[in-house]
Amino acid sequence: MIIYLPVICLVFAINAGAKLKHDSVANIPEDGRLDFVGLATKYGANTEEHDIVTDDGYVLKLFHLVGDRTRPVLLNHGILQSSDTFILRGNTSLAIQLVKRGYDVWLLNVRGNRYSRRHLYLNPNTDEEFWDYSFVEFAKFDISAAVDYILQATGEKRLSVIGFSEGTTSMYALGILKPEYNDKVKIHVSLAPVCYMYHTRPITLNIVQNIEHINRGLLLLNSNEVLSFYSAAKKLSDVSCIREKVGYDLCLLGIILPVTGGDKREIEEEFSRAAMGHFPAGTSRKNLYHLGQLGLRKFSHFDYGSMQNKAVYGTDTPPKLNLAKVTMKTALIVGRGDRISTVKDVRLLRDALPNVVKYIELQPDSFGHLNFVWGRNTHRLMFPMIFKLLEKYK
């Protein structure tokens, strides 16, 4: 989720349009250079690309790994990520493992990331309005459009959903804001669920507690787009994080794992360099800020401040998002070593949701946030649980 926040200060020093010498490509393993279609093709999946248009005009990329159309599964990525995160482990990745088991796999890219930086009439480079969104808009427009598109394409009435990190947040919001979609979901498997952020670990807690300052800094720089895949910040990431040994020690061991939790043995150096070729994939300042607000208050709509809240919502405070309305079957899977989606917070979520059919705390105790999508042994430790849930609630 908020993986790159510890280095947000670096972004303050970088103009989004700045040119940085980009000489690190040679250090990127092949899987770090391939895009989603390239990776899917390399690992033997029959792949399609679909463009879907939301009701508010965003053009989203939806990838399809062709399988049995009576068994559709939608994968929702986390913040600053893209659909790539579900295929980076190649033959042992979740996307490839699902399609090998016959599932019809669809992968959404929400507005603003590397694949969905398009709109019918707004220019992401010049129109601030393009970036006026958070996970609420992902729910109301992006995921709902993807669900409808997939169901129409397959002829099915329901589908399964697997979300990771913020990909779970937007699914809860969907069930609340568009309750009719609860009936379109067979089961929502929530990996590293993010809804409450009251018990994040020290480094992440400091970030959440200072989200107001981070937001103000980005506002001063007029940075409505954050950590774009095509920005100087991404080039800086490549130069710094993809260098052999130095990049691994600096970025993964020095920044990412202290924030997310996890065991370095699960994200080895060679894979780390490939993964960093796909990350960060971009988001909006507002989305980053809204997620940070989850640690400061209840699960609610975006907080603009009392004056603007009054104009937008008619109240001084933003309306709460009522989790009691999320009636879709939900499985919660949390890692004991996760510093972002903590066991204490996910237990609170379990108690708030009305239809939790399975709650799992993953071992070992070092199982961190990124283990869910990037872990070397996740296909062995967690995937069998997912497959069992999909089969049970088919």
Where do the model's predicted regions map?
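Alpha/beta-hydrolase-fold enzymes
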Residues: A18-K19, Q152-K157, E166-A311
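Short beta-strand/loop motif that positions the catalytic acidic residue
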Residues: V326, L332-V334, D338
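Short, surface-exposed "cap/lid" segments of acyl-processing enzymes
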Residues: T54, F63-N123
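Cleavable N-terminal signal peptides of Sec/SRP-targeted secreted and luminal proteins
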Residues: M1-A18, N123
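Catalytic active-site module of serine/aspartate enzymes centered on a nucleophile-bearing elbow/loop
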Residues: V357-K394
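N-terminal cap/lid segment of alpha/beta-hydrolase-fold proteins
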Residues: L34-G67
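Short alpha-helix in the alpha/beta-hydrolase fold that links the catalytic acid
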Residues: M328, T342-A352
